[in-house]
Amino acid sequence: MDYLESLDFPKVVEIVKKYALSDLGRKHLDTLKPTVNPWDELELVEELLNYFARWGEPPIKGLNDISQEVERVKSGSALEPWELLRVSVFLEGCDILKKDFEKREYSRLKETFSRLSSFRDFVEEVNRCIEQDGEISDRASPRLREIRTEKKRLSSEIKRKADDFVRTHSQILQEQMYVYRDGRYLFPVKASMRNAVRGIVHHLSSSGATVFLEPDEFVELNNRVRLLEEEERLEISRILRQLTNILLSRLNDLERNVELIARFDSLYARVKFAREFNGTVVKPSSRIRLVNARHPLIPKERVVPINLELPPNKRGFIITGPNMGGKTVTVKTVGLFTALMMSGFPLPCDEGTELKVFPKIMADIGEEQSIEQSLSTFSSHMKKIVEIVKNADSDSLVILDELGSGTDPVEGAALAVAIIEDLLEKGATIFVTTHLTPVKVFAMNHPLLLNASMEFDPETLSPTYRVLVGVPGGSHAFQIAEKLGLDKRIIENARSRLSREEMELEGLIRSLHEKISLLEEEKRKLQKEREEYMKLREKYEEDYKKLRRMKIEEFDKELRELNDYIRKVKKELDQAIHVAKTGSVDEMREAVKTIEKEKKDLEQKRIEEATEEEIKPGDHVKMEGGTSVGKVVEVKSGTALVDFGFLRLKVPVSKLKKAKKEEKEESSAVSYRPSSFRTEIDIRGMTVEEAEPVVKKFIDDLMMNGISKGYIIHGKGTGKLASGVWEILRKDKRVVSFRFGTPSEGGTGVTVVEVKV
């Protein structure tokens, strides 16, 4: 029984096949089926997806389907010139692809396609022997060149003789011309003059008035031309056979290249699909969790993302809700995504999605049921369910749509509960949809099951297609009837006919839905506030770094000035020592006086500055020669600990002076004034050429403002603009690193860049 078909697996594969380069890739995609070890395929898809994001499309020259040519080689046939050209271009493309992967950092791609064999000698031989238009070149062999040279010389001789014949026999010719037919030069002789020239008649005109004659003097020449043509044909056949034999001698290598390119084409198609559907690679996990999963058969403008998680201590979901509310799509998506992941396909969902490997995936979605149509009968359902129950075990993922429908509700519900119990006892993981109340109640009381429902908007009388976990769904019949104007008296009469338990259950479900709606609204508000908080936090972190950098630069300047002064004093001391060693007493005395005078001047200056205003904790001060204003934390033994906002320094009191009032205010303003520079640019809608100067200017602005991180919004689209931006950043030496944004930063629609500051 083909459960994959009921999950729309073949339809999704058909979508992916549209992105393949050739039939090689399309045939390979048809071979992909769920396996318990899909790691190799998934890792290759992931690496190629990363390759696309950073480098754009890999080189794909000439990677066409040459399966027919390979079969002809295997059968012993010599390939025609155009076939050899086609194979040569293919093999040249293999070489280019292999070399490209060898210089990249993707280990799985490099390892897999390192097995591509080089046919450089064959490619060179084909290029030497065959022209691009398919003609065999004179360079193909010395014998071929010799034959063609002789043939050309002989043809020239025949044409010269033919021109002479026309000129000297004009009276017997119907027209002053000759023709070349079947490798022979013939003359249109009047039938009445047939015997005027000895020769062979090859053709007669339809009117009988003209015979096409080959004069005896041309027979030998024409025979020699025909012989040369036959020799040329044989030599060309020999050359083609020789080229084909190169392929035949390396048939295993050739077939392996075809297989590897088929696999590459399949990977290429899957990556193009992922980029088109904003997909990601999901690797096998120990749990089931869908994050914004989007069914690929639903148009992008209509699809509602599915968010669903099966806790580790649960083994199944019972999903209820109104018809056409999205129940079937939800369970189908779980089964489909599991099958696709196990087959090596990327999935249209967000990061954080997790799926388990199930050796058995079984589903009952009804006969030929599609997402748009829900037609089934009880008997057809039951036939599939019987098969599923027989084969189910702990390795099984079971998808059952509208279990218990198509028959009496009471009996259907009882049967549904019994089937669910049996599947759980066998250890299967189950996803079941139903609208039967007893099944909802059963799920509420079973420790291994979770209820879920499809959200319904009572105001618009339509489903929202959002999954609500933890609460069963209602039919909403009374709400819909009341909204559409049915007499309240009739509605109350209908309610009174429900049992007390049914009324309590409906009331409980309605209350739970209302509470969940409120919680969802609160969750959205909190998420929005969190995003705003993260933006503010990042902004203030950038401001902090900028101000800290400014402070450090100021202190560096002051430190340089201090070092200059120390060097000056040291130089003068060195001079004094030199004088002491070599100079006269008068010179020594003069040097000592100079040093003592400078010492006294320096001490006096320090005393004046220190005594002018006593430095104490809490004072705002500046360093000698500096502009930064700091606050004194403590003073001990003539040294003050000064807080300059983002840096604390111990400074001699003699090197400090009190700051003026306006300097204090300015310092305060500078310390806490956030930058007004925007750390993001939006280049959506631009070409790569238009975006390049904008991106470079943005990097300039980041560095001028002392900001290390910025955001470039380019959108997702085809990925061409993103690839262009990455190429610009890769070449810019001011860029430290760049990456796609996290989901909260905008995902692959945003590039986060870090620059040197």
Swiss-Prot record:
The protein's assembly and partners: Homodimer. Binds to stalled ribosomes, contacting rRNA.
Record function comment: Endonuclease that is involved in the suppression of homologous recombination and thus may have a key role in the control of bacterial genetic diversity.
Species per Swiss-Prot/TrEMBL record: Thermotoga petrophila (strain ATCC BAA-488 / DSM 13995 / JCM 10881 / RKU-1)
Protein's UniProt name: Endonuclease MutS2
Record-listed ATP binding positions: G321, P322, N323, M324, G325, G326, K327, T328
Protein family membership: Belongs to the DNA mismatch repair MutS family. MutS2 subfamily.
Keywords of the record: ATP-binding, DNA-binding, Endonuclease, Hydrolase, Nuclease, Nucleotide-binding, RNA-binding, rRNA-binding
Domain Smr: residue ranges: 681-756
SUPFAM superfamilies per UniProt: DNA repair protein MutS, domain III, P-loop containing nucleoside triphosphate hydrolases, SMR domain-like
Domain of life: Bacteria
Gene name of the record: mutS2
EC number(s) stated in the UniProt entry for this protein: 3.1.-.-, 3.6.4.-
Statement: the UniProt record of this protein carries the keyword DNA damage: no
Entry's Gene Ontology molecular function annotations: ATP binding; ATP hydrolysis activity; ATP-dependent DNA damage sensor activity; endonuclease activity; mismatched DNA binding; ribosomal large subunit binding; rRNA binding
NCBIfam families on file: mutS2
